[in-house]
Amino acid sequence: MKLNELYNNIGAKKNKKRVARGIGSGKGKTAGRGVKGQKSRAGVAIKGFEGGQTPMIKRLPKRGFNCISSKKYNVINIYNIEAAIAEERLNANDVITKEKLIEIGLINKSNKKLVKLLSICSDDFNYPLSFKLDSYSSKAKEIVEKAGGKLL
């Protein structure tokens, strides 16, 4: 037996059914789509259409609303700032602003979103940094001021 003499067992590999290749193929003419109508045409069916019955999306009640006055925040944790200082992407003497955080890639550029400083997993923060951000959590304020930093 040689590599060029190897072959699959009979019936192990089925050929794909080729549609619209003559009446004798069994899938010719209408290619298994039936006769006329929306589903026989290109583009198939309308998504979400359930054959005339009230669709599920209409049967469920409406919930909630979008508050126009709500503020959307980019959140940044103190431990992210600590890591950036350790990696020397951020200078400990600089005032930390939204522009600076965008520049080093800690937050995404978005003019509409405000920046909020949080304090998750950062009880041992010891850099006397100055921050000029839009908002601070009460714990973050406490940690920064305890380390000798300023909130501008």
Swiss-Prot record:
UniProt xrefs under Pfam families: Ribosomal_L27A
GO cellular component, one term: large ribosomal subunit
InterPro entries: Ribosomal_uL15, Ribosomal_uL15/eL18, Ribosomal_uL15/eL18_sf, Ribosomal_uL15_bac-type
Keyword Protein biosynthesis: no
Single GO biological process annotation from the record: translation
Region (Disordered) location: 18-37
Biased composition (Gly residues): 23-35
Keyword Ribosomal protein: yes
Family to which the UniProt record says this protein belongs: Belongs to the universal ribosomal protein uL15 family.
Protein name: Large ribosomal subunit protein uL15
The encoding gene: rplO
